[in-house]
Structure formats: structure tokens, C-alpha cells
Design a protein with these regions (language model features):
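Active-site-adjacent structural elements that line small-molecule/cofactor binding pockets in enzymes
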Residues: 1-144
């Protein structure tokens, strides 16, 4: 994708992806294209982020996120890349922080190094979704 995002006429021949000269537009507004985030949770994430990605985007499901972030930073440094420019985003829902702990959990995630929290809104009727969006909006105002 980065070839396509950054070159007027892109061509790439790799192990898994192979394409002849091609053009694609419009190009992303952000120079170099948007960051590529690894959206997975496995033992291979640190190596794959270090080799291919600009950051990590897990679901906050009670896993050892602190350990994973440290492993990613270590692997990125081992590959000679700056660990200070990584993008750590996380996806969460109200159900993952029960008992009114959502604000505290967001604070915990920020302390771990996440720079973006995205909220999942379950598929439902608008009259069920709007109260959830209102709660998220009120919460977001506390952090901006």
C-alpha cells in the first residue's frame, strides 16, 4: 500500500504481493499515507509491528496490554527503528469496563502508552445507540 500511496506509478514484487506498474488516486492527504497499524493480539505481533507497521491496534479484552506494548517497543528498537513514533490505539466497549470503570480504564490505557481510544458501538436501533453515544461524548469531553 505504501508504494501505491507514495508513487505516481507504483510497482511491487514481493513474497506475498506482486503487481505490475499501476496508478491509483487520489493519494492520501497525509504524506506517506496513513499509519499502518497491526490489529491483532498474538505472540507474533511484536515482530510484525517492527517489520511492517507504524503501530498497534488491539481490542481491550483484559489481555496483558502493558507487556505487549513493552515487547513491541523492544522489538522495534531491536530493528533499529525509533520506538517513540509508534501509534498505539485501542478499541473498547462499555462491556469491557463494567461497573462505571470506563473512565478509570481509559486513564489506565493512557498510562500504558495508548494515544487513541476508539469506542465500539454495538449494532442496535437508534434509540438504543444514542444513549451510548451520549455517554461516550460526555466521557470524551473529560479528556480533551
Amino acid at each position: 500500500m505504501k508504494e501505491i500511496w507514495t508513487k505516481a506509478l507504483a510497482e511491487y514484487h514481493g513474497k506475498f504481493v506482486n503487481f505490475e506498474p499501476t496508478w491509483c488516486g487520489p493519494k492520501p492527504a497525509q504524506a506517506g499515507g496513513p499509519p499502518v497499524l497491526m490489529g491483532a493480539q498474538s505472540k507474533w505481533v511484536p515482530q510484525r509491528v517492527a517489520e511492517y507497521c507504524d503501530g498497534w491496534f488491539p481490542v481491550d479484552a483484559g489481555d496483558d496490554l502493558a507487556g505487549s506494548i513493552e515487547a513491541i517497543r523492544s522489538e522495534v528498537a531491536r530493528h533499529g527503528r525509533s520506538k517513540d513514533v509508534l501509534d498505539f490505539s485501542v478499541l473498547m466497549t462499555e462491556q469491557l469496563a463494567p461497573g462505571g470503570r470506563l473512565e478509570a480504564r481509559i486513564q489506565d490505557l493512557i498510562k500504558l502508552g495508548f494515544n487513541r481510544v476508539l469506542f465500539l458501538v454495538s449494532a442496535a436501533r437508534p434509540d438504543e445507540q444514542l444513549p451510548v453515544l451520549d455517554r461516550y461524548a460526555a466521557l470524551i469531553r473529560k479528556f480533551v
